[in-house]
From Swiss-Prot:
GO terms for molecular function: ribosome binding. Belongs to the RimM family. Pfam families: PRC, RimM. The PRC barrel domain binds ribosomal protein uS19. Keywords: Chaperone, Cytoplasm, Ribosome biogenesis, rRNA processing. An accessory protein needed during the final step in the assembly of 30S ribosomal subunit, possibly for assembly of the head region. Essential for efficient processing of 16S rRNA. May be needed both before and after RbfA during the maturation of 16S rRNA. It has affinity for free ribosomal 30S subunits but not for 70S ribosomes. It comes from the Bacteria. It is found in: Cytoplasm. GO terms for biological process: ribosomal small subunit biogenesis; rRNA processing. One of its GO terms (cellular component) is cytoplasm. It comes from Kosmotoga olearia (strain ATCC BAA-1733 / DSM 21960 / TBF 19.5.1). This is Ribosome maturation factor RimM. NCBIfam families: 16S_RimM. HAMAP family: Ribosome_mat_RimM.
Length: 200
């Protein structure tokens, strides 16, 4: 059963996440996990997956409409707020074959998520845990757990000035760190004001 599920998931990608119920008729608010929004124009049959419990639900989209940066979705058979509440936090998986082809230099969000990020010298920066859409360009959120169990977070714009190479098959990204992060900790405190002037 587990192998069958893994084989099934391998042929699908997460395109959304159920945030919360919407209204009283079984609709839900869904956060998009893909920057290729055309996928939602024809998307019908999906898998709903709860990572914590390992629960999988086959579902079919009845209606979907844009709402701000997310979507309002109604799955067939969901007729109440209680039914919608049961899938809160579930990921929405779509078949790979419904995705539109990519142009050179384009990517899907799922390709970035969980990638390990290294600087050009091979130093480990962290793992991609989220993606921020700014309008002008995407920004990856890179987090790293430190020895004292605190978490260090860096933001890296997905533009050619910072991204050196994508290695999606290896789930790796080579990227330059932001200038202020590179300088941090490498200058004496006496030079603090000079560093701020240089960056601004």
């Amino acid at each position: 059963m587990i192998k069958e599920f893994r084989d099934l998931i391998d042929s699908m990608i997460p395109v959304g996440k159920v945030v919360k119920p919407h209204g009283l008729r079984g609709e839900v608010k869904m956060k998009s996990l893909t920057n290729q929004l055309k996928v939602f124009e024809t998307l019908k049959k999906v898998l709903l997956y709860d990572e914590k419990a390992g629960t999988v639900v086959r579902a079919e989209i009845d209606t979907i409409r844009r709402a701000g940066k997310g979507y309002i979705v109604h799955f067939k058979g969901f007729k109440s707020v209680e039914a919608a509440e049961r899938i809160r936090g579930f990921y929405v998986y779509a078949p790979l074959n419904v995705l539109p082809p990519l142009k050179e230099g384009e990517y899907y969000f799922y390709q970035l998520l969980d990638c390990e990020v290294y600087d050009p010298e091979g130093e480990y920066i962290g793992k991609v845990t989220d993606i921020i859409e700014t309008g002008a360009n995407d920004v990856i959120v890179v987090t790293k757990e430190l020895p004292d169990f605190t978490v260090e977070e860096e933001l890296i714009p997905v533009i050619k000035d910072y991204i050196v190479e994508f290695r999606f098959k290896d789930k790796k990204i080579v990227a330059k760190r932001l200038e202020y992060l590179t300088l941090e900790g490498k200058e004496d405190n006496d030079d603090e004001n000079q560093r701020i002037d240089d960056i601004s």
